[in-house]
Design a protein with these regions (language model features):
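Generic C-terminal helix-cap and adjacent flexible tail
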Residues: 325-332
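Active-site proximal beta-strand in glycosyltransferases
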Residues: 82-97
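Conserved acidic donor-binding segment of nucleotide-sugar-dependent glycosyltransferases
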Residues: 274-280, 289-294
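Catalytic-core regions built around general acid/base machinery
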Residues: 78-86, 107-108
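Nucleotide-sugar donor-binding catalytic core of glycosyltransferases
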Residues: 1-52, 59-61, 67-77, 110-270, ...
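A charged, aromatic-enriched C-terminal amphipathic alpha-helix characteristic of glycosyltransferases
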Residues: 28, 292-323
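Alpha-helical elements of Rossmann-like donor-binding domains used by nucleotide-donor carbohydrate transfer enzymes
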Residues: 20, 48, 52, 282-289, ...
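Short hydrophobic patches on amphipathic alpha-helices
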Residues: 57-58, 82, 203, 287
Length: 332
């Protein structure tokens, strides 16, 4: 149960959930019954959408009901009806616990059999809310069925794929002023957004892929703006955190230069599998360094690629979820 389109808008293309979660589960060999709550609510209204969801769950009789809620699409009663009539344990992937645990997750997580979080700092909050027995710490990953090494030929020097939030434009300008022009794609940049295949190619064929934080300002995604409208959004700068990009770029065989964030060293050997920077000055210096050291850069990219395929694909993440539900962990 998730959005098929990015923020529910077909003009923006497939959603993260569609490109990563659904694609990975299908690649693992699982049969899925998809329900786009955003589209059904838009067409039929929220009340009717909830009825249709419960009916779909009853018809599917699936092994697990997996949710990626956006805001307040469902209430606890609907989730409990899905479990009761569908006969399957319910799971929600909580993507934003770093900023909306207290005014979102804490209220809806009790309705699920399992809450999956990517935020280690929220685990004490789950415990305090009496949810310690139903939370699983997971992490973003790479969907190996959608992100692959497509070429070993270099086509770009320094690239960034993402939106110009916070001080990103300023940082890009500083790198460019140091003699290293940065090619940028995404909503808000002149070049616009890449399609998925184009993005994968950029990751695979860039000397240096940048992963920039927007922690200098509050996040401003549509999910955040809707959350603010509902009284659930962050009001101040948020700490940097691990993102999907930390796994997607290495998963394409690309070299990643990313901001140092808490817990990243639990997933990679820093400096050996991905490169990290500590400040804008350090970033500018490292861009120059890595552009000049081809063999060392290639070794880091290859090590990161092997680490992702060995430990950090969505196959690994979903297998852990299935084990937590006592459904077994085989990917077949």
């Amino acid at each position: 149960m998730a959005m098929a389109n990015d923020y529910g808008n077909p003009e923006r293309g497939p959603s993260f959930e569609e490109t990563n979660f659904r694609s990975a589960l299908e690649g693992m060999g699982h049969e899925l019954v998809a329900f786009d709550f955003m589209e059904r609510a838009r067409v039929a209204g929220k009340t009717q959408m909830r009825r249709e969801l419960v009916a779909a769950a009853a018809d599917a009789r699936a092994d697990v009901a997996f949710f990626c809620l956006f805001t307040d699409e469902l209430d606890a009663g609907t989730i409990e009806d899905v479990r009761r009539r569908g006969g399957a344990p319910t799971v929600n992937w909580f993507a934003d616990d770093h900023w909306r645990f207290d005014n979102f997750t804490k209220n809806i997580a009790p309705a699920f059999d399992l809450a999956v979080t990517t935020d280690a700092a929220s685990l004490p909050k789950y415990e305090a809310a009496g949810l310690g027995g139903k939370v699983l710490l997971s992490q973003w990953a790479c969907n190996r069925y959608a992100y692959t090494r497509v070429s070993e030929d270099i086509e770009h020097d320094v690239t960034f794929v993402g939106q110009p939030h916070g001080n990103r434009q300023e940082i890009i300008d500083r790198i460019t002023a140091a003699g290293h022009p940065v090619e940028c794609w995404g909503y808000g940049w002149p070049a616009g957004k890449l399609d998925h295949a184009g993005m994968v190619r950029v990751f695979s064929t860039s000397r240096v892929n940048l992963n920039l934080s927007n922690s200098s300002t509050p996040p401003n995604t549509l999910r955040v703006r809707v959350g603010r409208w509902l009284g659930r959004g962050p009001t101040g700068p948020q700490p940097p955190q691990i993102k999907g990009r930390n796994f997607e770029v290495p998963g394409c065989g690309g070299f990643l230069l990313t901001e140092s964030v808490p817990h990243l060293d639990k997933y990679f050997e820093l400096g050996k599998e991905v490169a990290v920077y500590e400040s804008p000055d350090d970033l500018v210096e490292q861009v120059g360094y890595w552009l000049e050291h081809d063999d060392e850069r290639a070794a880091v990219a290859d090590a990161g690629y092997r680490r992702v395929l060995a430990e950090h694909t969505y196959d690994h993440r979903f297998e852990a979820i299935f084990r937590a539900l006592q459904l077994g962990g085989d990917a077949a």
